[in-house]
Regions:
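Hydrophobic alpha-helical connector segments
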Residues: 65, 79-108, 155, 179, ...
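Solvent-exposed, amphipathic alpha-helical segments
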Residues: 19, 23-30, 77-84, 158-166
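Generic hydrophobic, amphipathic alpha-helix propensity
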Residues: 12, 16-25, 41, 62, ...
Length: 261
């Protein structure tokens, strides 16, 4: 029986991880963080329960990676939306609107994410977080910053503060008010990005997030092996010659060669 190639094994592992990320986002959004167990996430993903701990140290780290994925893919989608723009101010407006919309549409996820960042262990350095930092750093650079290493953390802090203010139980601030302050800070025109009046603020919230996770059908096995779940799906760790596939940004640095939160 001929073994699968290393590239096929890596693709299977990548998709297994994608399913876990998607399952974490779905379940925490539906049930809340405390009511969601790692076993629940594994079951929703169709994976062996032991596989979760192979990819992630714990539930908090898994959720942070999942929300960072949701955030960076949301930003990518906003920046690539037609008509595409290379204008730095328009791109900054789209980033601000995308993050504020996440706070509006996914309050349970974003509130738990903010709470997790304040834990003693701090944020999780993962491929999804690195990609998010790269997008924000690139946005700051295209906006015209001459000091990205200083202006990137400020943008991050302002966005986090806006999300926090929008989600404080009992006394949340309105998204248009927060948007106005951020737009004033960056000297953006109200018509840029996606103004609140362009989509009803009390309209339906987006709930289908599956497009942000690459969970396509697994590649077919070779002719001498019956198709089925991969070794990774059964909880079998990779062999010495086929280590876990890493995202291309996992060991990368953000703009300016510095790792970012």
């Amino acid at each position: 029986m001929s073994p699968r190639s290393a590239s096929v094994n890596e693709e299977l592992r990548r998709r297994s991880r994608e399913r876990l990320l998607q399952a974490a986002v779905e379940l925490v959004s539906e049930r809340g963080y405390d009511a969601t167990t790692l076993g629940d996430i594994a079951d929703r993903a169709g994976s062996a329960r032991g596989l979760v701990s192979y990819y992630f140290p714990g539930k908090r780290q898994l959720l942070q990676s999942a929300v960072h994925r949701l955030m960076h893919r949301t930003l990518e989608e906003a920046l690539e939306r037609e008509p595409r723009s290379e204008d730095g101010r328009e791109r900054m407006a789209r980033v601000i609107d995308a993050i504020l919309r996440l706070a509006r549409d996914q309050p349970v996820l974003m509130r738990q994410h903010m709470a997790g960042l304040l834990q003693a262990e701090g944020f999780v350095q993962c491929p999804e977080q690195v990609r998010l930092s790269e997008l924000l750093g690139d946005t700051v650079a295209r906006y015209g910053s001459q000091q990205v290493s200083a202006d990137y953390p400020m943008l991050r802090a302002l966005l986090m503060g806006a999300v926090y203010a929008a989600l404080v139980p009992g006394v949340p601030m309105k998204v248009p008010v927060l948007r106005a302050e951020l737009f004033k800070r960056y000297r953006l025109d109200w018509e840029m990005g996606v103004p609140p009046d362009a989509e009803a603020s009390d309209g339906p919230r987006e709930t289908d997030l599956s497009r942000f996770f690459a969970t396509d059908p697994e590649p077919e096995a070779g002719p001498s092996r019956q198709p089925g779940r991969g070794d990774a799906e059964r909880g079998v760790p990779p062999g010495p010659d086929t280590g876990l596939a890493r995202g291309k940004h996992e060991r990368a640095s953000g703009p300016g060669g510095q790792r970012r939160a």
